[in-house]
């Protein structure tokens, strides 16, 4: 029987995932505590707009797609204290709050780290410095898509990819919120209609087309797995796809996905919850 094998949220966009025993799905369809902060380029410290919603394209801030070395950092966020702690190679780089002084210190440390990485030239492009740490540390708002969504993939799909690659692939490369076990490989790509995780009801939306972030080793930050070309050339996909987007249901249909929308029921999903679909 398909069930939840692992749950993740990513408090700071592009940085260390936090493994959880349970996650709260907010009425707006986003995961509480997921992507509540982001390091943005100077020219992109305010949101763009898409379909009437705030949109924060990952190409305009620190993200693994362009800055794979970020994966080598170990970042933790204390939501109650509003405090960010960043470590590298067991060395504490910074431990600061989200007040004005703390945000400046965090941005300074991240800037220094990236400028000392192989991707340093990318950060020196016009309009990118100084970095800005944006977000209130509470509202989930920096997902890749304006509408938010919950992301899910199956362990079997990752195992099939590992076989085609000839090396073991870590689930964390895909930065999904929900990892399921007990389903056949690639089943999630064919889901239609309602998907239920525990007591929370979703509607299956589009499959997730992957980017270069998946090439980065989640421990070292080195691009050591050609995930995209393996999905297309070896596994025959038209686009490099792994995983599915889920939209929270409401009595009126799907929620809008706007930050703070309260039309959905929300709820809690837990490791071990049964997953039904179709």
Predicted regions mapped to residue ranges:
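Metal-cofactor-dependent catalytic cores
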Residues: 1-278
């Amino acid at each position: 029987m398909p069930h939840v094998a692992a749950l993740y949220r990513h408090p700071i966009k592009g940085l260390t995932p936090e493994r959880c025993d349970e996650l709260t799905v907010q009425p707006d369809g986003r995961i509480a505590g997921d992507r509540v902060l982001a390091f943005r380029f100077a020219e992109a410290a305010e949101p763009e707009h898409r379909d009437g919603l705030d949109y924060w394209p990952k190409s305009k801030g620190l993200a693994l797609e362009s800055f794979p070395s970020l994966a080598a950092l170990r970042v933790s966020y204390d939501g109650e204290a509003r405090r960010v702690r960043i470590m590298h190679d067991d060395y504490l780089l910074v431990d600061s709050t989200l007040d004005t002084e703390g945000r400046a210190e965090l941005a300074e440390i991240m800037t220094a780290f990236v400028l000392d990485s192989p991707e340093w030239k990318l950060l020196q492009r016009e309009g990118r410095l100084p970095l800005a740490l944006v977000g209130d540390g509470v509202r989930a708002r920096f997902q890749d898509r304006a509408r938010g969504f919950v992301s899910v993939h199956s362990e079997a799909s990752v195992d099939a990819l590992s076989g085609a690659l000839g090396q073991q692939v870590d689930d964390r490369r895909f930065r999904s919120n929900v990892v399921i076990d007990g389903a056949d490989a690639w089943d999630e790509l064919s889901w239609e209609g309602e998907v239920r995780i525990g007591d929370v009801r979703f509607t299956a939306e589009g499959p997730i087309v992957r980017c270069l972030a998946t090439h980065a080793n989640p421990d070292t930050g080195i691009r050591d797995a050609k995930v995209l070309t393996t999905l297309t050339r070896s596994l025959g996909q038209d686009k490099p796809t792994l995983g599915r987007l889920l939209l929270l249901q409401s009595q009126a249909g799907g929620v809008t996905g706007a930050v703070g929308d309260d039309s959905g029921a929300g709820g809690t999903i837990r490791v071990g919850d049964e997953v039904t679909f179709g």
